[in-house]
Each structure stands twice: as structure tokens, then as C-alpha cells.
Amino acid sequence: MTKPIILTGDRPTGKLHIGHYVGSLKNRVLLQEEDKYDMFVFLADQQALTDHAKDPQTIVESIGNVALDYLAVGLDPNKSTIFIQSQIPELAELSMYYMNLVSLARLERNPTVKTEISQKGFGESIPTGFLVYPIAQAADITAFKANYVPVGTDQKPMIEQTREIVRSFNNAYNCDVLVEPEGIYPENERAGRLPGLDGNAKMSKSLNNGIYLADDADTLRKKVMSMYTDPDHIRVEDPGKIEGNMVFHYLDVFGRPEDAQEIADMKERYQRGGLGDVKTKRYLLEILERELGPIRERRIEFAKDMGEVYNMIQKGSERAREVAGQTLSEVKGAMGLHYFN
């Protein structure tokens, strides 16, 4: 019996951080190990170029780092197909066919695109590739006939746009070639949108407010000890706030069930007064090191042979291209574009 297909991936614009880990990577590994799905995981370098077109080297260099992060967290090339988007030219051809099914006005109404255009400050100079990348995402998803796409809740409009394209294509050509995907969204919204160490809503390289999977133990310690807490909690005996306190936010996200009572007790003591920030940060450091230490060690081991890392990705890309090629052939057949025997 054919397994349901999952497609997921990341833009390779730098090393991945713990926001990526709790928001998607950890769940991908769980889904992989269930062995109920055929999983495709891709490095979306073409999508990253939509706002890094003049700095492609950043993307190229990031491919290796993101691949290391994938392997370190437990994604296994023998269980999941890991590939590079630009190595699958069939995706670009699918995008071209789908563009004829989507109006410019519809693209401009996409809430996710509108938000990202505002955040990136494009003004009137919006790259065409950026505006149409929801169509490229639809090509990525449909090329592998993905049944499920794990994404953050902010990506719901993208999934809906893909579903619209699938319906438009199948209706226009009276076929059922394309599969309508469903989004898989984080159950823990706090994990799905992990804020930065400084309390900023976004953890990012540009803001220098993230913990990266590649960070060594000393770097992790320094970052945790510098985290934003309650600025009015000056003395240990002062009552403190846990709302907006990044240490407690991270404890809620990374704590395991067996940690729940200790975390609850710490919250009560902190709010009452009598618990200092240094102690809460040290406790968080223990919990993070428990989670990230093994990942760090695996990453170091994989990094010793980057040739083998790229070999794994090449094999995955070859398999992905075979699958995408079959879908493209079916799409062209439905459109009547097979001219020769």
C-alpha cells in the first residue's frame, strides 16, 4: 500500500536555530520515525534567491550548513528524501503552467506575501520572483503529490493557494492529476513561533538574537545568561513577571513532562519574590544542553566528511527528480502537450 506523502523544507539563508528545531525539525523526525509516510525534505535555494538574488554565495554556503543541521537532528537520507530545489528543473516548468491559472490580483491578496513584502521593505521594487513564489511553492508541493505539508500557522494562506491551484488545474483539464494537500500545523503555538532571546517576536540571524544548532556549549551558555527577563526584577527578593520573560517562555517550550512541576514551582517563587534570574537561567541552560548537546555532537561528526554529506543530498535529488519528472509528464499529458511519440 502506498504511503501518504509529506513535503517540507527550509530556505537555506544560514544555519538553522532552535526556533526551526521546535517549530518543525523535531516534528519531522517524529513523523519520519513513525514510518507511515514517504517524506521529502528540500533545501529551497531558488525560493531563497527571491530576496537574495545579488548574494547567491550566501545561499550556496548555507546549503552545507542546513544539510548538517538536518542530519544532526535525526533526518535520515535512508528514510527521507533530502534534496536541493534548484536541482529539480521540472519544478520551474510546473510553475510556468500554474502561473496561467493565478491572477496577479490573487497573488497580491495573499496575506503571507503581503506581510513579508512589508517586513522586507521592498516598497515599489518587489521582485517578480518574490511575488510569485506561492506559485513556485505549489509546484514544489504538487510535484511530489504531497498529501501533507507541515508548516507554521502563518503559512496557512500558502497552503490554501496551492489547494486553489490544484482545483483550478484539475477542473480546467478535467483530470485528477494533482493532489490537494493539507497543512499540518504546530499543536504548541508557543513552539511554532519561538521569539528571540531579546524578546523580539522573531528569532533571526540579522537580529543576532538566536541560538543555533551549531552553537558550542560556551556560546550557548553566554546566550542563555544574556536572555531578556523582567527588567523590573532587580533584586532576588523582588516579585517578578513571567509574562514576556523569555526564560520562562523557553522553559515552557523545551521542558519535558517530568520538568513540569519544577517549572511551575519556579514560576510561583519568581512571581512571589525570592528567585533570581541567574538561577532560572542556569536551570534553562541545563534543559537546553540536554536537548542540544547530542545534536551538537552529531553535527560535529557529520561535518568531518562534507563530501559524504553532499553525496547523500545528490542521491536524494536524483530520486526527487524522478518523482517530479513523472508528475510533470502527467501534467503535460493532461494539457495535451505530448507532441511526439
UniProtKB/Swiss-Prot annotation:
Pfam families: tRNA-synt_1b. It is an enzyme of class 6 (ligase). A motif ('HIGH' region) lies at residues 12-20. GO terms for molecular function: ATP binding; tryptophan-tRNA ligase activity. Its main location: cytoplasm. It catalyses: tRNA(Trp) + L-tryptophan + ATP = L-tryptophyl-tRNA(Trp) + AMP + diphosphate + H(+). ATP binds at R11, P12, T13, G19, H20, G152, T153, D154, L194, K202, M203, S204, K205, S206. HAMAP family: Trp_tRNA_synth_B (MF_00140_B). This is Tryptophan--tRNA ligase. It comes from Streptococcus pneumoniae serotype 4 (strain ATCC BAA-334 / TIGR4). The lineage of its organism: Bacteria, Bacillati, Bacillota, Bacilli, Lactobacillales.
